[in-house]
Amino acid sequence: MNPCNLASDPKDSLVRSRAAMPTPRPLHLRIKAAVGLGLVLAPLAASAAAPTQRLAPPAEHDLAAAAVVTSRIASTAPPGGPVSFTWPIDQASDDLVARPAPHSATTTGHAQTVDAAALRRGVPLAISSPGAFFKVSPAARDLRIITPDGHTLRPGAGLRPIGSDPLAFTLDPAAGTGLFTLRAEADAPIHIDVLERGSEFVLLVQAARDVVFVGEQIHLEARLLHRGRPVPVERLHARLVAPNGHTLTRSLARQRDGGYVATLPVQGEPDARPWSIEVELDATVAGRTVRRTATTAVAVSAPTARLTGTAVVTHPGEGVRAEFALDVASDSRYALSAVLHGHNREGQLQPIAVSQSAAALTPGRRNLALEFDARLIADSGLRAPFELHDLRLVDQGRMFVLHRQARALALDR
């Protein structure tokens, strides 16, 4: 039997393979590289007599789908048979992150895009720290800035060029702070970036998660810090921008700790591209006008498959093999991975190895297995009881993260 040519139903493949073979032989092929890494073609079925174990309940920051949906986005995964890799972890160099930190943004500046008419009339720039840096897009001509006391600054006269860029300047620190006005000529919309380096006014923005499912909500937190302490703002809103350009705007509500929060519902058909969150605020602090804008991002997935919450665990040759049950809604190539942990002599958990497997799956109840070689476990010096951490399921054809669980399964031995 060629292990790469699998039928859509693993049980059918197993029946045909047994009928074709006059003598028993292993159901998988392991190819070991000289460096000790292994390539394992995924086994077709677990022993029917093996006990079924349940995954641990998802923790607060884990990602787990309650149901599956069919995606209208076609899978782009290239054709190929099932495959699995297992490799040991170098305890001295591997930096494992089972719970990736959500994307966040920290800024001391602001940005905006204005049309040519607004640029001719004058665009207000709130400067809260002397010597701010600013840059405009190349379409701007005859650039000038009016200071709060009415003086006009031009390139070379109050506007200090930065390097060879003719449209990047630093304001003369002697011009102070306040509401400046930028004027220029242009035939197209102009993007303006302002950065107040070293400012004591800092905007922090963070989503509660880096991945959410379509139909869920993004929980967003923002706060303006003045010398490290949160301060109130007059205007603060967030705009969720989908890859197709659709936007949703929400105001943020102040909390007792001085931060501001909002929930942004995620609707639409996601694809592999991230969704961006743009936050804008205006505030007056210690008599100074402060404007800040920040952009962060989240990934949005459609749960095209999910782990049902059960696994069949066996110990072939005293190694570890865990076969996970999946509920699949859309054709694609799916990948499963986890990190095996064992106990050292002090009774502390340490990582042993990473296992990954992938296969093209059709809708229905399917399985993916992870396997850890007995020699690999023995070489680690770690012992049972073992645990599987950082369990992840990914739709490779659509680049969707479908499951991520920091501590997934305590093995029976």
Region spans (language model):
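Surface-exposed beta-strand/loop patches in noncatalytic accessory domains
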Residues: 102-104, 109-110, 137-166
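A short beta-turn/strand-edge loop motif at beta-sheet boundaries
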Residues: 136, 211-214, 225-235, 327-336, ...
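Short, solvent-exposed loop/linker segments at the N-terminal edge
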Residues: 210-216, 313-317
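Beta-strand-rich structural segments
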Residues: 215-228, 240, 322-325
